[in-house]
């Protein structure tokens, strides 16, 4: 069960639809100086671009603690990219330095993907994904086949093959858990996208807004998310009927032929069950418009080109509703 929930037609080629969707090493807090923009022709809701007008917010300060953890950290230290907090070290094997960070590290994998590997919507859930697949995706970033000039492109170009291997093997060894709850609604809570962490948050004014043709993903525990607590999951609001429509598209496409029973992965083919809907949608849009390439993406391009925006929302919603293992 997700922890802390808000306290209070398509051809059989859809079987390869998400073969190139597996989580990639996408860092969410990497380059604060890079201007984030939505690629032309793509829906802005999928890219978590911070609102220009920001409501006042209270940021964590001083010593912070995560519920259920015996550890504590200085908020300012763990807010950067070099020293991700390890709130629950007994829940995973010892991480390599490229993941854990520390002295001499500029960007630690765990700062955006968390020590659990499950990340936030602006990053990716890579827990339990095949090491060979993750290594291949890093090679795509390094060659430019996958484009992310603000984040993963620069990281891939400066990360050694050995560090990539160690990080991939670490994340592949982890067991994913349910990290997102998908809720269908026509009127989700009113939200805004915060500059800090690029997370969509509940608007302090309250109220609701029409869902329209969007996926709105918010932290179930905003403070826990900001201090990178791996137990602080997310809620994804999606249009009514999305899950059933997505299930129909996935089943008619026979996607389990590639992704295995329950869409939990098979061999080097990645798990797509339980991935965050916003992340999946973003990858589908990226494939359609050319910023996601490489051998794995090539057979998907003609398939993704036929999908409507509502199809992408539905497929992403259904995958997010599935148990990850």
What function would you assign to each model-found segment?
Residues 120-126, 266-273:
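Short cysteine/histidine-rich zinc-coordinating motifs and their immediately flanking basic loops
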Residues 34-107, 147-157, 161-253, 289-325:
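Flexible coil segments in periplasmic/lumen-exposed cytochrome c-class electron-transfer proteins
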Residues 5, 115, 135-136, 244-251, ...:
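Long compositionally biased, domain-poor regions of proteins
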Residues 1-12:
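N-terminal secretory signal peptides that target proteins for export/translocation
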Residues 111-118, 143-145, 172-176, 258-264, ...:
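Detector for the c-type heme attachment site
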Residues 127-153, 262, 273-279, 283-284, ...:
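Extended intrinsically disordered, low-complexity coil regions enriched in Ser, Thr, Gly, Ala
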Residues 13-27:
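Bacterial N-terminal signal peptides
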Residues 26-34:
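Bacterial Sec-dependent signal peptides at the C-terminal "C-region" and cleavage site
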